[in-house]
């Protein structure tokens, strides 16, 4: 017999049903398809053949550029996420204070994050141009340098520039996530700490950081996913040149699939990247949760 109690029991699931269907269609189903394709033979024309086991994975791992790409991806994620997190906390602490023009500074800070990554990378490409780049022009006009500097003289320096642009566009996201956590902290905690003789660093380590940890955890996990999957910066600035020396996993599998037409290994590489990303994000969340629980 139908009763209001039964309706209340199922009502939350009915409200969630549209979201669940969208996630299933656009997230879960494509993931299942990619996993299936990674174990299938795929021709250069994209024709799907039979089951080949782990052959695609073997070919992907044995490719000459695989080790370089994996190391680049590691340093790309570590440097961009790590440095942007530190700088984001610094900017959040600054913006949490009251000062004249704070709203203007906040608007300026959010601009790099809100602008298209392709535009950002293109602008930075122009700034560091050897012949007519703005950076060389400014330094020459100020008399700081006597002749133009080649800011992209090696692939190592180009990779550093990629990381720098990644940090530049990511800092605002971290800053505003942490700022939201800072603004939820009760001011009386700082007043009590001041009365007890606590200094700036004592308040930071014992009050601020522990209380903004939930916001920081969310921003870090999202940042890892966002940076790992970032395609426009690397592709716009270098396209992985020379010889995949500045490639990350995302740009490499794109080139592998659409330029070299090796769709099987590219699919396997995408699965490897997905599993690595899940492992890193999961490990970070578990570590943080254990610290919060005091285990």
Describe the predicted segments one by one:
Residues 4-295:
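A structural signal for multi-pass alpha-helical bundles of membrane permease subunits
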């Amino acid at each position: 017999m139908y009763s209001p109690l039964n309706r209340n029991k199922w009502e939350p699931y009915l409200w969630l049903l549209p979201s669940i269907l969208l996630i299933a269609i656009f997230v879960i189903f494509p993931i299942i398809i990619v996993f299936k394709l990674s174990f299938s033979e795929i021709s250069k024309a994209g024709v799907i053949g039979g089951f080949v086991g782990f052959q695609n994975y073997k070919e992907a791992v044995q490719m000459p550029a695989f080790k370089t790409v994996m190391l680049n991806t590691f340093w790309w994620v570590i440097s961009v996420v790590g440095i942007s997190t530190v700088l984001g906390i610094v900017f959040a602490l600054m913006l949490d204070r009251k000062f004249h023009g704070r709203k203007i500074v906040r608007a300026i800070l959010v601009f790099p994050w809100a602008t298209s990554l392709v535009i950002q990378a293109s602008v930075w490409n122009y700034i560091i141009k050897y012949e007519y780049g703005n950076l060389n022009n400014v330094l020459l006009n100020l008399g700081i340098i006597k002749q133009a500097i080649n800011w992209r003289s090696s692939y190592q320096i180009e990779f550093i520039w990629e990381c720098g642009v990644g940090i530049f566009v990511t800092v605002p996201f971290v800053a505003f996530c942490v700022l939201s956590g800072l603004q939820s902290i009760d001011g009386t905690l700082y007043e009590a700490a001041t009365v007890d003789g606590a200094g700036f660093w004592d308040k930071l380590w014992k009050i601020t950081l522990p209380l903004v940890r939930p916001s920081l955890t969310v921003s870090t996990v999202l940042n890892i996913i966002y940076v790992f999957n970032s395609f426009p910066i690397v592709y716009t600035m270098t396209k992985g040149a020379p010889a995949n020396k500045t490639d990350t996993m995302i740009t490499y599998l794109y080139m592998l699939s659409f330029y070299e037409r090796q769709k099987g290994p590219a699919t396997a590489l995408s699965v490897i990247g997905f599993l690595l990303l899940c492992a890193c994000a999961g490990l970070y969340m578990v570590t943080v949760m254990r610290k919060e629980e005091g285990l």
